[in-house]
Amino acid sequence: MANKLFLVSATLALFFLLTNASVYRTVVEVDEDDATNPAGPFRIPKCRKEFQQAQHLRACQQWLHKQAMQPGGGSGPSWTLDGEFDFEDDVENQQQGPQQRPPPPQQCCNELHQEEPLCVCPTLKGASKAVRQQVRQQQGQQMQGQQMQQVISRVYQTATHLPRVCNIRQVSICPFQKTMPGPGFY
């Protein structure tokens, strides 16, 4: 009888710990195609207003554009084989001298910290979409096909991990879903 009571108590305690631990990590998934959704990345009207008040995350847009346009990833963020950022490597390289990889500017992180946690991913998606349009307008004649897709993919991959880099509580990544085959995020 004592063994059963102990087993039930231990199971309940474990269940409580697992439930409590999962409350502190929230991932907001943005999975609608902007082309079929008239609200674009802003399914929540409050997020559209925050995006406009934050001046469309201007500092983040500038940084995303700069990182996406790095030729061959030369001095941009380093990537692991599974497409993840290797941020630890970036931090080490920042301390090694003049050829350092720039972290997101503090102003970009400040913009993200001012967002409601629920709106971080939708506003980042809006900023990424603006950068995508800017790249297409500026580079449309020089870049075609796969090269353009790679640049646009880098925009979204970089934006995906910005919440983690900027230490945004309750949001570690923004899992932007691919809506078309291939490496691009559209």
Swiss-Prot record:
UniProt KW S-adenosyl-L-methionine keyword: no
Source species, domain of life: Eukaryota
Gene3D superfamilies linked: Plant lipid-transfer and hydrophobic proteins
Residues of the signal peptide: 1-21
Listed InterPro entries: Bifun_inhib/LTP/seed_sf, Bifunc_inhib/LTP/seed_store, Napin/2SS/CON
Keyword Disulfide bond among UniProt keywords: yes
SMART domains: AAI
Propeptide residue intervals: 22-38, 77-97
Tissue expression: Cotyledons and the axis.
SUPFAM superfamilies for this protein: Bifunctional inhibitor/lipid-transfer protein/seed storage 2S albumin
GO molecular function, one term: nutrient reservoir activity
Keywords noted in UniProt: Disulfide bond, Seed storage protein, Signal, Storage protein
Function, in words: The small, basic, water-soluble napins are one of the two major kinds of storage proteins synthesized in the seed during its maturation.
Family: Belongs to the 2S seed storage albumins family.
Subunit structure comment from the entry: The mature protein consists of a small and a large chain linked by disulfide bonds.
Protein name as catalogued: Napin embryo-specific
Protein's organism: Brassica napus (Rape)
